[in-house]
């Protein structure tokens, strides 16, 4: 595996959101990995934070966005101890609202403060759907993460170089998805998707910095001829 590769996913969909809402799975994690969580909720934006084993602190990318009939918010955390991650708890207000929450674990090493690009969330209801532009990146080696919540059960397709990593619908109400790819230049990027036009949507873009010091100091294997 290499920097930015997918270690695994956790997910949950329900017709009624609970407090907490718990994306579940089984993913082996290492120190320096990144966990990214996207929460899609019907009508109300109530997700306030995330917690789990092996991650000391999760942070919200921003305050989230209420697009009308669907809302979305994302959280991220850097893995601080190794183990098998089986659940993430997302604090939210219990109600009859539908919810779809998904998480992806990305292989590191990421810097201790990895978040770089964090533009404001946008809405787009006409395919192709453009997430916000990242802006010029702080360094060449970064992971681009894009996510979306769309008010329709239809499948969306990631537009290259974006690669869809997870997508989960709750009934026909909404679908939450995460895509990603690794870049090797500081040039701004604009992630995109195509698919069924939704009633409304929330789209986000973030980038996370590779720990170049840790990576470059790893022992290298050379063949003896």
What label would you give each PLM region?
Residues 1-225:
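Primarily extracytoplasmic/secreted proteins
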């Amino acid at each position: 595996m290499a920097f930015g590769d997918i270690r695994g996913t956790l997910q949950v969909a329900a017709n009624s959101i609970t407090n907490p809402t718990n994306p579940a799975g089984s993913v082996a994690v290492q120190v320096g990995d990144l966990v990214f969580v996207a929460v899609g909720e019907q009508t109300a934006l109530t997700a306030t934070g995330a917690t789990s084993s092996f991650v000391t602190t999760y942070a919200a990318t921003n305050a989230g966005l209420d697009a009308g009939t669907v809302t979305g918010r994302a959280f991220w955390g850097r893995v601080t101890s190794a183990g098998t991650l089986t659940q993430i708890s997302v604090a939210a207000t219990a109600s009859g609202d539908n919810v779809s929450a998904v998480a992806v674990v990305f292989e590191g090493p990421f810097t201790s403060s990895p978040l770089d690009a964090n533009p404001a969330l946008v809405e787009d209801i006409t395919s192709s759907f453009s997430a916000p532009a990242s802006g010029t990146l702080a360094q060449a080696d970064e992971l681009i993460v894009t996510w979306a919540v769309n008010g329709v059960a239809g499948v969306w397709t990631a537009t290259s170089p974006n690669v869809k990593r997870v997508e989960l619908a709750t009934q026909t109400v909404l679908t939450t998805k995460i895509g990603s790819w690794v870049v090797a230049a500081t040039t701004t990027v604009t992630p995109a998707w195509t698919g069924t036009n939704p009633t409304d949507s929330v789209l986000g873009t973030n980038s996370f910095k590779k720990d170049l010091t840790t990576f470059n100091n790893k022992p290298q294997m050379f063949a003896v001829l």
